[in-house]
Amino acid sequence: MESHAKTGTQQMVPAAPHGLALRSSAIVARGLRDLARDSNWLIKKIFTVRCSQLAISASGQVCAVAMMAPLGTERICLFDIELSAPIAMLAIPPDQPGGAPGLPAAFVYSPTARLLVAAWGAWPPELQVFDLHGKTFLGSFGGFSNLPEALAWSPSGKYLASATLGGREARLRLWEAADSRFGMPFTGNPVAELPAPSKLDDLLGAQTPETESVDDGTVAGFGRAAFSPDDGTLAAVVRVEGEWADDALALFDVPTLRRQHAFQTQGRITDVSWAFDGRQVIFCAAGQAYRLLADTMQPDPLPLGAEFCVCHPHLPLCLCYSSWLKNSAKGRLFLIDLERMAVFDEYPAEGVVDLRWSLDGSKAYAVTSDGLAYIYEPPLV
Protein backbone atom coordinates (compact mmCIF):
# COMPACT_ATOMS: atom_id res chain seq x y z
CA MET A 1 0.00 0.00 0.00
CA GLU A 2 1.20 3.46 -0.77
CA SER A 3 -0.10 6.65 0.81
CA HIS A 4 -1.63 9.31 -1.46
CA ALA A 5 -3.63 12.49 -0.91
CA LYS A 6 -7.07 12.74 -2.52
CA THR A 7 -9.31 15.82 -2.31
CA GLY A 8 -7.89 16.98 0.97
CA THR A 9 -7.84 13.57 2.63
CA GLN A 10 -5.05 11.07 2.92
CA GLN A 11 -5.43 7.43 2.01
CA MET A 12 -3.18 4.40 1.87
CA VAL A 13 -3.85 2.52 -1.37
CA PRO A 14 -3.00 -1.19 -1.89
CA ALA A 15 0.11 -1.55 -4.03
CA ALA A 16 -0.67 -5.13 -5.08
CA PRO A 17 -3.67 -7.50 -4.69
CA HIS A 18 -2.23 -9.99 -2.21
CA GLY A 19 -5.72 -11.06 -1.09
CA LEU A 20 -6.84 -14.22 0.61
CA ALA A 21 -4.88 -16.50 -1.69
CA LEU A 22 -1.60 -15.29 -0.28
CA ARG A 23 -2.85 -15.53 3.28
CA SER A 24 -4.17 -19.05 2.69
CA SER A 25 -0.90 -20.14 1.15
CA ALA A 26 0.94 -18.59 4.07
CA ILE A 27 -1.15 -20.64 6.51
CA VAL A 28 -0.43 -23.83 4.56
CA ALA A 29 3.26 -22.98 4.39
CA ARG A 30 3.35 -22.41 8.13
CA GLY A 31 1.76 -25.81 8.76
CA LEU A 32 4.32 -27.55 6.54
CA ARG A 33 7.27 -25.78 8.07
CA ASP A 34 6.11 -26.62 11.62
CA LEU A 35 6.24 -30.35 10.80
CA ALA A 36 9.97 -30.06 10.20
CA ARG A 37 10.90 -27.77 13.08
CA ASP A 38 13.23 -29.00 15.77
CA SER A 39 13.12 -25.90 18.01
CA ASN A 40 10.76 -23.15 19.16
CA TRP A 41 12.41 -20.65 16.81
CA LEU A 42 11.76 -19.90 13.16
CA ILE A 43 14.04 -17.70 11.02
CA LYS A 44 12.78 -15.99 7.88
CA LYS A 45 13.69 -13.09 5.60
CA ILE A 46 10.94 -10.46 5.60
CA PHE A 47 12.63 -7.73 3.52
CA THR A 48 15.78 -7.33 1.45
CA VAL A 49 16.30 -3.57 1.72
CA ARG A 50 18.49 -2.03 4.39
CA CYS A 51 16.52 -0.34 7.19
CA SER A 52 18.16 2.19 9.47
CA GLN A 53 15.39 2.19 12.11
CA LEU A 54 12.35 0.00 12.74
CA ALA A 55 9.62 -0.95 15.20
CA ILE A 56 7.56 -4.16 15.50
CA SER A 57 3.84 -4.24 16.24
CA ALA A 58 1.96 -6.76 18.38
CA SER A 59 0.25 -7.98 15.19
CA GLY A 60 3.50 -8.90 13.47
CA GLN A 61 4.05 -5.85 11.29
CA VAL A 62 7.27 -3.88 10.99
CA CYS A 63 7.45 -0.12 10.38
CA ALA A 64 10.88 0.80 9.05
CA VAL A 65 12.94 3.55 7.44
CA ALA A 66 13.93 1.68 4.27
CA MET A 67 16.49 2.56 1.60
CA MET A 68 14.85 2.71 -1.83
CA ALA A 69 17.52 1.70 -4.35
CA PRO A 70 18.48 2.91 -6.93
CA LEU A 71 16.94 6.27 -5.95
CA GLY A 72 19.26 6.69 -2.99
CA THR A 73 16.44 7.97 -0.78
CA GLU A 74 14.60 6.48 2.18
CA ARG A 75 10.87 5.92 2.75
CA ILE A 76 8.73 4.80 5.68
CA CYS A 77 7.55 1.28 4.82
CA LEU A 78 5.39 -1.39 6.44
CA PHE A 79 6.24 -5.10 6.20
CA ASP A 80 4.30 -8.20 7.25
CA ILE A 81 6.39 -10.78 9.12
CA GLU A 82 4.13 -13.76 8.39
CA LEU A 83 3.82 -12.94 4.67
CA SER A 84 7.46 -11.83 4.32
CA ALA A 85 6.22 -9.01 2.11
CA PRO A 86 5.92 -5.20 2.00
CA ILE A 87 2.36 -4.02 2.54
CA ALA A 88 2.54 -0.19 2.50
CA MET A 89 4.61 2.93 2.05
CA LEU A 90 3.49 5.74 4.34
CA ALA A 91 3.34 9.37 3.31
CA ILE A 92 1.75 12.61 4.42
CA PRO A 93 0.45 15.30 2.04
CA PRO A 94 1.99 16.44 -0.15
CA ASP A 95 3.33 12.98 -0.98
CA GLN A 96 7.09 13.43 -0.75
CA PRO A 97 9.47 11.36 -2.91
CA GLY A 98 11.50 10.34 0.11
CA GLY A 99 14.09 11.58 2.54
CA ALA A 100 17.86 11.74 2.61
CA PRO A 101 19.57 8.72 4.17
CA GLY A 102 20.23 8.78 7.89
CA LEU A 103 17.45 11.08 9.05
CA PRO A 104 16.21 10.28 12.59
CA ALA A 105 12.83 8.63 13.14
CA ALA A 106 10.62 7.35 15.96
CA PHE A 107 7.62 5.00 15.80
CA VAL A 108 5.10 3.54 18.21
CA TYR A 109 2.10 1.29 17.58
CA SER A 110 -1.09 1.42 19.61
CA PRO A 111 -1.62 -1.62 21.89
CA THR A 112 -3.95 -3.25 19.33
CA ALA A 113 -1.66 -2.26 16.41
CA ARG A 114 -4.53 -0.41 14.70
CA LEU A 115 -2.85 2.99 14.93
CA LEU A 116 0.72 4.13 14.31
CA VAL A 117 2.28 7.37 15.55
CA ALA A 118 5.45 8.31 13.68
CA ALA A 119 8.00 11.11 13.47
CA TRP A 120 10.65 11.40 10.77
CA GLY A 121 13.25 13.98 9.87
CA ALA A 122 11.90 14.24 6.29
CA TRP A 123 8.42 15.19 7.54
CA PRO A 124 7.21 18.38 9.25
CA PRO A 125 8.18 18.49 12.96
CA GLU A 126 4.97 16.97 14.33
CA LEU A 127 3.76 13.53 15.38
CA GLN A 128 1.91 11.91 12.46
CA VAL A 129 -0.97 9.46 13.05
CA PHE A 130 -1.97 6.62 10.68
CA ASP A 131 -4.99 4.32 10.93
CA LEU A 132 -3.59 1.04 9.59
CA HIS A 133 -6.94 -0.76 9.64
CA GLY A 134 -8.83 2.05 7.94
CA LYS A 135 -5.89 2.71 5.60
CA THR A 136 -5.96 6.45 6.26
CA PHE A 137 -3.69 9.21 7.49
CA LEU A 138 -5.56 10.81 10.39
CA GLY A 139 -3.51 13.96 10.94
CA SER A 140 -0.78 15.38 13.13
CA PHE A 141 -0.29 16.81 16.62
CA GLY A 142 2.46 17.51 19.13
CA GLY A 143 4.83 19.83 17.29
CA PHE A 144 8.44 19.58 18.45
CA SER A 145 11.80 21.30 18.02
CA ASN A 146 13.79 18.10 18.62
CA LEU A 147 12.60 14.85 17.06
CA PRO A 148 11.63 12.37 19.81
CA GLU A 149 14.27 9.93 20.95
CA ALA A 150 11.48 7.56 22.00
CA LEU A 151 7.69 7.21 21.94
CA ALA A 152 5.60 5.04 24.28
CA TRP A 153 1.89 4.12 24.24
CA SER A 154 0.22 2.96 27.45
CA PRO A 155 -1.26 -0.58 27.57
CA SER A 156 -4.86 0.70 27.75
CA GLY A 157 -4.27 3.11 24.87
CA LYS A 158 -5.17 6.10 27.03
CA TYR A 159 -1.78 7.84 27.14
CA LEU A 160 1.11 8.53 24.79
CA ALA A 161 4.53 9.74 25.94
CA SER A 162 7.23 11.50 23.94
CA ALA A 163 10.83 11.68 25.18
CA THR A 164 13.39 14.00 23.59
CA LEU A 165 17.04 14.87 23.95
CA GLY A 166 18.48 18.35 23.54
CA GLY A 167 19.71 19.60 26.91
CA ARG A 168 17.64 22.61 27.93
CA GLU A 169 15.17 21.89 25.13
CA ALA A 170 14.67 18.26 26.19
CA ARG A 171 11.16 17.34 27.30
CA LEU A 172 9.10 14.43 28.59
CA ARG A 173 5.55 15.04 27.37
CA LEU A 174 2.30 13.17 27.98
CA TRP A 175 -0.96 13.23 25.99
CA GLU A 176 -4.31 11.77 26.97
CA ALA A 177 -6.43 10.14 24.28
CA ALA A 178 -9.65 11.80 23.16
CA ASP A 179 -13.00 9.98 23.33
CA SER A 180 -12.99 8.98 19.68
CA ARG A 181 -13.05 5.42 18.39
CA PHE A 182 -11.99 6.12 14.81
CA GLY A 183 -10.78 9.72 14.76
CA MET A 184 -7.58 11.39 15.93
CA PRO A 185 -6.64 9.82 19.28
CA PHE A 186 -4.54 12.78 20.46
CA THR A 187 -4.93 16.48 19.81
CA GLY A 188 -3.77 19.80 21.17
CA ASN A 189 -1.35 20.34 24.01
CA PRO A 190 -0.01 17.60 26.29
CA VAL A 191 -1.68 17.12 29.67
CA ALA A 192 1.75 17.19 31.31
CA GLU A 193 5.21 18.31 30.25
CA LEU A 194 8.46 17.91 32.16
CA PRO A 195 11.70 19.67 31.20
CA ALA A 196 14.89 17.69 31.73
CA PRO A 197 16.95 18.70 34.78
CA SER A 198 20.18 20.48 33.87
CA LYS A 199 22.25 18.29 36.22
CA LEU A 200 21.68 14.72 37.32
CA ASP A 201 22.07 15.79 40.94
CA ASP A 202 18.89 17.86 40.54
CA LEU A 203 17.03 14.59 39.92
CA LEU A 204 18.84 12.34 42.41
CA GLY A 205 20.30 14.54 45.13
CA ALA A 206 17.27 14.75 47.42
CA GLN A 207 16.88 10.97 47.69
CA THR A 208 20.52 9.81 47.53
CA PRO A 209 22.11 8.80 50.87
CA GLU A 210 25.08 10.91 51.94
CA THR A 211 27.29 7.82 51.82
CA GLU A 212 26.61 7.37 48.10
CA SER A 213 28.28 9.48 45.45
CA VAL A 214 26.27 11.00 42.63
CA ASP A 215 27.74 11.65 39.21
CA ASP A 216 26.79 15.29 38.76
CA GLY A 217 26.79 14.96 34.98
CA THR A 218 25.04 17.18 32.49
CA VAL A 219 21.67 15.77 31.48
CA ALA A 220 21.20 15.31 27.72
CA GLY A 221 17.47 14.63 28.01
CA PHE A 222 15.12 11.66 28.08
CA GLY A 223 15.50 8.29 26.34
CA ARG A 224 13.49 5.06 26.28
CA ALA A 225 10.21 4.99 28.20
CA ALA A 226 7.57 2.41 29.15
CA PHE A 227 4.20 2.53 30.94
CA SER A 228 3.25 0.19 33.77
CA PRO A 229 0.46 -2.33 33.01
CA ASP A 230 -2.10 -0.22 34.91
CA ASP A 231 -1.05 3.02 33.13
CA GLY A 232 -0.26 4.54 36.53
CA THR A 233 3.52 4.92 36.23
CA LEU A 234 5.92 5.86 33.46
CA ALA A 235 9.49 4.56 33.61
CA ALA A 236 11.81 6.82 31.60
CA VAL A 237 15.54 6.89 30.97
CA VAL A 238 17.34 10.11 31.89
CA ARG A 239 20.30 10.35 29.52
CA VAL A 240 23.58 11.87 30.67
CA GLU A 241 26.03 13.48 28.24
CA GLY A 242 29.27 11.69 27.51
CA GLU A 243 30.24 8.46 25.77
CA TRP A 244 30.96 6.65 29.05
CA ALA A 245 28.34 8.40 31.18
CA ASP A 246 26.05 6.61 33.63
CA ASP A 247 22.36 7.15 32.88
CA ALA A 248 19.50 7.23 35.39
CA LEU A 249 16.11 5.51 35.44
CA ALA A 250 13.19 7.52 36.81
CA LEU A 251 9.61 6.54 37.65
CA PHE A 252 6.92 9.20 37.18
CA ASP A 253 3.25 9.34 38.17
CA VAL A 254 0.73 9.36 35.33
CA PRO A 255 -0.75 11.78 34.36
CA THR A 256 1.05 14.38 36.50
CA LEU A 257 4.64 13.28 35.71
CA ARG A 258 5.50 13.82 39.36
CA ARG A 259 8.68 11.94 40.19
CA GLN A 260 8.23 8.83 42.34
CA HIS A 261 11.77 7.47 42.37
CA ALA A 262 15.03 7.75 40.47
CA PHE A 263 18.43 6.10 40.65
CA GLN A 264 21.64 6.11 38.65
CA THR A 265 22.81 3.01 36.81
CA GLN A 266 26.17 1.92 35.49
CA GLY A 267 26.50 2.82 31.83
CA ARG A 268 24.04 3.68 29.08
CA ILE A 269 20.45 2.37 29.47
CA THR A 270 19.33 0.87 26.16
CA ASP A 271 15.87 -0.56 26.97
CA VAL A 272 13.17 -0.77 29.63
CA SER A 273 10.05 -2.97 30.02
CA TRP A 274 7.47 -3.67 32.76
CA ALA A 275 6.61 -7.17 33.94
CA PHE A 276 2.96 -8.10 33.41
CA ASP A 277 2.01 -7.68 37.10
CA GLY A 278 3.60 -4.23 37.45
CA ARG A 279 5.75 -5.37 40.38
CA GLN A 280 9.08 -5.16 38.60
CA VAL A 281 10.79 -3.24 35.82
CA ILE A 282 13.30 -4.97 33.56
CA PHE A 283 15.97 -2.75 32.02
CA CYS A 284 19.27 -3.09 30.18
CA ALA A 285 22.32 -0.97 30.99
CA ALA A 286 25.89 -1.29 29.67
CA GLY A 287 25.04 -4.66 28.14
CA GLN A 288 23.65 -6.15 31.39
CA ALA A 289 20.00 -6.94 32.18
CA TYR A 290 18.56 -5.86 35.55
CA ARG A 291 15.26 -5.95 37.37
CA LEU A 292 13.91 -3.27 39.69
CA LEU A 293 11.50 -4.58 42.33
CA ALA A 294 8.67 -2.24 43.31
CA ASP A 295 8.90 -3.06 47.01
CA THR A 296 12.67 -2.47 47.35
CA MET A 297 13.44 -0.06 44.50
CA GLN A 298 16.87 -1.66 44.26
CA PRO A 299 18.16 -2.94 40.89
CA ASP A 300 19.35 -6.56 40.82
CA PRO A 301 21.30 -8.06 37.90
CA LEU A 302 19.66 -10.83 35.89
CA PRO A 303 21.73 -13.92 34.98
CA LEU A 304 22.48 -12.65 31.47
CA GLY A 305 23.75 -9.72 29.49
CA ALA A 306 21.32 -7.88 27.20
CA GLU A 307 20.78 -4.67 25.26
CA PHE A 308 17.07 -5.15 24.54
CA CYS A 309 14.22 -6.62 26.59
CA VAL A 310 10.45 -7.04 26.38
CA CYS A 311 8.21 -8.69 28.97
CA HIS A 312 5.37 -11.10 28.20
CA PRO A 313 1.87 -9.53 28.38
CA HIS A 314 0.49 -11.97 30.99
CA LEU A 315 3.24 -14.40 32.09
CA PRO A 316 6.42 -13.91 34.17
CA LEU A 317 8.62 -14.20 31.07
CA CYS A 318 11.00 -11.78 29.40
CA LEU A 319 12.63 -11.95 25.98
CA CYS A 320 16.12 -10.43 25.87
CA TYR A 321 18.78 -9.94 23.22
CA SER A 322 22.54 -9.62 23.65
CA SER A 323 24.76 -8.75 20.71
CA TRP A 324 27.85 -10.13 22.41
CA LEU A 325 28.49 -13.22 24.49
CA LYS A 326 31.52 -14.03 26.57
CA ASN A 327 33.92 -16.28 24.64
CA SER A 328 31.89 -15.73 21.46
CA ALA A 329 31.61 -13.06 18.80
CA LYS A 330 27.95 -13.86 18.18
CA GLY A 331 24.78 -12.62 19.83
CA ARG A 332 21.88 -14.52 21.34
CA LEU A 333 18.17 -14.32 22.13
CA PHE A 334 17.15 -15.45 25.63
CA LEU A 335 13.86 -16.33 27.31
CA ILE A 336 14.07 -15.81 31.06
CA ASP A 337 11.68 -17.02 33.77
CA LEU A 338 11.28 -14.02 36.08
CA GLU A 339 10.07 -16.18 38.98
CA ARG A 340 12.94 -18.67 38.97
CA MET A 341 15.39 -16.11 37.54
CA ALA A 342 16.65 -18.67 35.06
CA VAL A 343 17.10 -18.87 31.29
CA PHE A 344 14.92 -21.65 29.85
CA ASP A 345 15.27 -21.08 26.09
CA GLU A 346 17.83 -19.37 23.87
CA TYR A 347 18.82 -19.07 20.24
CA PRO A 348 21.82 -17.59 18.35
CA ALA A 349 21.03 -14.29 16.63
CA GLU A 350 22.91 -11.30 15.26
CA GLY A 351 21.97 -7.71 14.47
CA VAL A 352 18.60 -7.61 16.29
CA VAL A 353 17.30 -4.05 16.75
CA ASP A 354 13.77 -4.57 18.15
CA LEU A 355 11.71 -7.14 20.09
CA ARG A 356 7.95 -7.58 20.57
CA TRP A 357 5.45 -10.11 21.93
CA SER A 358 2.25 -10.71 19.99
CA LEU A 359 -0.96 -9.30 21.43
CA ASP A 360 -2.05 -12.64 22.92
CA GLY A 361 1.48 -13.62 23.96
CA SER A 362 1.50 -16.75 21.79
CA LYS A 363 4.68 -15.74 19.96
CA ALA A 364 7.51 -13.23 20.05
CA TYR A 365 9.31 -11.38 17.27
CA ALA A 366 12.89 -10.18 16.89
CA VAL A 367 13.94 -8.35 13.71
CA THR A 368 17.31 -7.21 12.36
CA SER A 369 18.04 -4.07 10.33
CA ASP A 370 18.68 -6.18 7.21
CA GLY A 371 15.29 -7.90 7.35
CA LEU A 372 15.89 -11.16 9.18
CA ALA A 373 13.09 -12.13 11.58
CA TYR A 374 13.39 -14.55 14.50
CA ILE A 375 9.97 -15.83 15.54
CA TYR A 376 9.51 -17.61 18.87
CA GLU A 377 6.48 -19.95 18.78
CA PRO A 378 6.51 -22.21 21.84
CA PRO A 379 3.80 -24.89 22.10
CA LEU A 380 2.68 -24.03 25.64
CA VAL A 381 2.71 -20.20 25.82
Listing of model-derived features with the role each one plays in the protein:
Residues 2-381:
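WD40-repeat beta-propeller superdomains and closely related acidic/aromatic-rich repeat-like regions
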